[in-house]
A protein has these predicted regions:
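Bacterial N-terminal signal peptides
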Residues: 5-14
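C-terminal tail/extension regions appended to the core domain(s) of diverse proteins
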Residues: 472-473
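Residues forming the ATP-binding cleft of Hanks-type serine/threonine protein kinase domains
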Residues: 441
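Formylglycine-dependent sulfatase
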Residues: 2, 17-429, 433-435, 444-467, ...
């Protein structure tokens, strides 16, 4: 449930980049929706990420593999899909299934890079695990730093709109006293800059993971960021009357089964204000990292990849919040890659790409071989799109989510979805618990489920996409362990 930005300093032969081995700055932002000005959100004030997007390639159709923190982060770092690593919840570590997996940072270390982490790259329970190693993978790093700021000591001040739930999952927020640098994410930026300053003089290049905790709940940021978003300007997303009537029950996350958590509109608007405030706060920390790259004379030998672990609902479909769905808002995720002197820099890419593509992209750019073993990486390099964002691609994206049995569902249900340029097809329990089809050419907000009363064209599309989906994702509940309370 987070957002990631990856900055990589890499060597490139025959594509115009520096001949020396590049450094990698890998920045992850938690729970970041594409609610950024560079992605067309006119409310957001995100000048630093916007500037990064303008200097790199902004992927407008990038999709995560499972919109929940632990599975998606494990998938990115291993380059493997959830069905391969058997991670669907917040408790299972990918090494339980693939103990010999070679992670992205491990591959760089094996080829002469120093690899370190500041903050959240793998899963953390937020805010409980802030200041610890969280659900880390020790073989992935040579050094780790786990800052803990005043947001931890100020937790008793946080407003919780849903007191019956923990602040980790509830709509909760705090307009905090103090400076950016006192907050955990401000400290993360500070520590990352210190490491870059030290490592710039080392003989070995660095791969530095920088993981920010916000805008994950609770939405905590200094007061000045809340002031940037007057409450009068906050509007909840439009949804037509009866929007939910054609949507299967399983499509709604078990932790958000009723519209807006039954909260009133004013409270939801305050939550929206708080989300945008934390978004701008994290944007400022990204700006500090970018400024440090310039100041330390590292920018020309650094690739930047900015991404979040998944998308995020902000009230769409008449009251969906947070993640854990297969709708566009949860599956689609920010992804920006800036490679020095890449021909595609400054251009947006509308091709369909997946987060399993990040790993092979970075190894390709660095001229590294992917790890050998019984399991091959399951994505493909985006290097051709960094050269020419308009290049032919023929991409599809697969996203899954596992539902526990509850009052709504008599038994667990696997959901899986495939996104093409025009269509999104989703089925639940292989169709036994519902099917969805949305035509993004006519219905980009996914209001009209064509699978309910399909015409001949819709029937043909569903048949074709179901076959493609079955090739890459199981519709069955896994036989490996999972914790129903942590899905």
């Amino acid at each position: 449930m987070r957002f990631f930005v990856v900055i990589l300093c890499l060597s490139f032969v025959s594509v115009g980049w520096s001949a020396s081995k590049p450094n990698v700055l890998f920045i992850a932002i938690d729970d970041l929706a594409p609610a950024l000005r560079c992605y067309g959100d006119l409310i957001a004030k995100t000048p630093h990420i916007d500037r990064l997007a303008a200097s790199g390639v902004r992927f407008d159709r990038a999709y995560n593999q499972l919109p929940l923190c632990n599975p998606t982060r494990a998938s990115v770092m291993t380059g493997l899909r959830p069905d391969t690593i058997k991670v669907y919840d917040l408790d299972r570590h990918f090494r339980d299934e693939v103990p010999k997996a070679v992670t992205l940072s491990q591959t760089f270390m094996r080829n002469g890079w120093w690899a370190g982490r500041v903050g959240k790259i793998y899963h953390y329970n937020v805010p409980a695990s802030i200041g610890t190693d969280g659900f880390d993978d020790p073989p992935s790093w040579k050094q780790t730093v786990n800052p803990k700021g005043r947001d931890k000591t100020d937790e008793h001040l946080i407003f919780n709109a849903e007191p019956h739930r923990k602040i980790s999952g509830a709509l909760s927020w705090l307009a905090a006293e103090g400076t950016d640098e006192e907050q955990t994410d401000g400290m993360i930026a500070t520590e990352a800059i210190k490491l870059m300053a030290v490592k710039r003089n080392d003989k070995e290049p660095f791969f530095l993971g920088v993981g920010f905790f916000r805008p994950h709940t609770p939405y905590v940021a200094p007061k000045k960021y809340f002031a940037m978003y007057p409450l009068k300007d906050m509007r909840l997303p439009y949804a037509p009357k009866g929007d939910r009537d054609d949507i299967p029950t399983a499509a709604f996350a078990h932790n958000n089964p009723v519209p807006h958590y039954s909260l009133d509109a004013l409270t939801c608007r305050k939550a929206l204000q708080a989300y945008y405030a934390t978004l701008s706060f994290v944007d400022a920390q990204v700006g500090r990292l970018m400024a440090a790259l310039e100041r330390l004379d590292l920018a020309d030998n650094t690739i930047v990849v900015l991404w979040s672990d998944h998308g995020y609902h902000l009230g769409e479909h008449n009251g969906l919040w947070q993640k854990r769905t297969l709708f566009e808002q949860s599956a689609r995720t920010p992804l920006i890659i800036r490679a020095p002197n890449a021909k595609g820099n400054g251009t947006a890419c509308a091709r369909i790409v997946e987060f399993v593509d990040i790993y092979p992209t970075l190894t390709d750019l660095a001229g590294l071989k992917n790890p050998k073993g019984p399991i091959a990486l399951e994505g493909r390099s985006l290097k051709p799109l960094l050269k020419n964002p308009l290049a032919e691609w023929n991409g599809t994206a697969i996203t899954q989510v596992l539902r526990p049995a509850d009052k709504r569902l008599p038994k667990p249900v696997m959901g899986r979805s495939i996104r093409t340029v025009r269509w999104r097809y989703t089925d639940w329990a292989e169709g036994k618990s519902g099917v969805e089809l949305y035509d993004h050419a006519a219905d980009p907000m996914e209001f009209n489920n064509l699978a309910l009363k399909p015409d001949p064209e819709a029937k043909a599309v569903m048949q074709r996409l179901r076959k493609l989906l079955e090739q890459k994702a199981s519709g069955k509940v896994p036989t490996t362990p999972f914790n129903p309370k942590r899905l």
